[in-house]
């Protein structure tokens, strides 16, 4: 293995060899459903990262060789001037995506004072795709418990325990602590597991639902949900039990956003109210997607534009037009 650091532009910290195992994508049961059009992963060039920021790409299989699927690189960002007390932001991409797709949002997190991890995970199918058609509202709880913590039975997805989000994050933090001991990544672990009280969780689409579920089940530093977590039975509009349950994370730490024109805007607005997210902590995005985007026809570009590079609108200077909204949602990591 070869470790490296870039201060000015995105680099590969752990060399990715030709023998890397490609992700074996999961297949939704109803591939023609509108719910399957959440997000497709475009190929794009990462923007430059400002000087003074270290960026790593690390394969999930390098931190845990038993992980064979969904093996696109995790992205790690650290600003040189961060104090030792800086907290951690973990971002989860949407369905079919990878962390690099939302690099500008990750950079915004680093600029807000967090150490940042964009975490790859099993995201071939989402909860609304899988459990939305299921008449059992608890399908969503089983789905997310298995995908995130690896400790529930769900016949609807084939995720393995070692592929769980918690295991991926735990193994990555241990790996980073060995790779860069002077950065003390072990501060974000307790008894070998993620120290959620020092971790802000954020995500887009399916990833927003991941962040929300973790916030419901663990006391985290902050929850940032970009257009996610509307788990319900579509035929009856009955919410998943976890949506209506009490939150382990105090509600004043919850933040969320959605686009007023995205197809599931009404569902998200209702879900955020049921969860109890303070109305002052919710941003409704209104700008048109970047007209130069290269996304396939038929996708909900308003939904994708919340954080995805090439679709997120830009200002007159070519910078993300939602920068101020992102900064509000992120708060301070220091």
Tell what function each PLM region has.
Residues 6-17:
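Bacterial N-terminal signal peptides
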Residues 21-25:
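Boundary at the C-terminal end of the N-terminal hydrophobic targeting segment
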Residues 28-82:
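N-terminal cap/lid segment of alpha/beta-hydrolase-fold proteins
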Residues 80-81, 221-314:
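The feature captures the conserved acid-bearing segment of alpha/beta-hydrolase catalytic domains
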Residues 85-94:
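Short beta-strand element of the alpha/beta-hydrolase
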Residues 94-192:
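Serine-hydrolase catalytic machinery in alpha/beta-hydrolase-like enzymes
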Residues 202-207, 211:
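Gly/Ala-rich beta-loop-alpha elbow adjacent to hydrolase catalytic centers
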Residues 300-334:
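Catalytic active-site module of serine/aspartate enzymes centered on a nucleophile-bearing elbow/loop
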């Amino acid at each position: 293995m070869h470790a490296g650091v870039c201060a000015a532009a995105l680099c590969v910290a752990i060399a990715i060899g030709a023998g890397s195992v490609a992700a074996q994508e999961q297949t939704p049961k109803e591939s023609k459903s509108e719910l399957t059009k959440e997000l497709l992963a475009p190929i794009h060039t990462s923007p430059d990262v400002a000087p003074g920021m270290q960026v790593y790409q690390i394969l999930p299989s390098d931190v845990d060789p038993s992980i064979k699927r969904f093996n696109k690189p995790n992205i790690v960002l650290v600003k040189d001037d961060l104090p030792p007390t800086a907290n951690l932001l973990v971002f989860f991409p949407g369905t079919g995506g990878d962390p690099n797709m939302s690099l500008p949002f990750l950079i915004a997190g680093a600029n807000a004072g967090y150490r940042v991890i964009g975490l790859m995970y099993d995201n071939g199918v989402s909860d609304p795709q899988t459990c939305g058609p299921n008449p059992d509202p608890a399908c969503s709880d089983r789905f997310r418990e298995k995908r995130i913590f690896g400790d529930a039975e769900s016949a609807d997805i084939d995720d393995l325990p070692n592929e769980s989000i918690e295991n991926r994050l735990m193994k990555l933090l241990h790996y980073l602590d060995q790779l860069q001991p002077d950065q003390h990544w072990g501060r974000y672990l307790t008894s070998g597991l993620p120290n959620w009280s020092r971790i802000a969780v954020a995500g887009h689409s399916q990833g927003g639902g991941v962040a929300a579920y973790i916030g419901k089940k663990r006391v985290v530093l902050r929850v940032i949900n970009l257009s996610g977590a509307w788990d319900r039975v579509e035929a009856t509009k009955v919410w998943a039990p976890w949506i209506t349950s009490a939150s382990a994370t105090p509600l004043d730490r919850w933040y969320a956003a959605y686009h007023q024109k995205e197809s599931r805007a009404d569902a998200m607005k209702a879900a955020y109210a049921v969860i109890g997210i303070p109305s002052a902590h919710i941003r409704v995005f209104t700008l048109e997607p970047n007209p130069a985007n290269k996304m396939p026809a038929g996708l909900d570009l308003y939904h994708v534009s919340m954080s995805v590079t090439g679709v997120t609108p830009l200002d007159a200077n070519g910078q993300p037009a939602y920068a101020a909204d992102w900064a509000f949602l992120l708060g301070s990591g220091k």
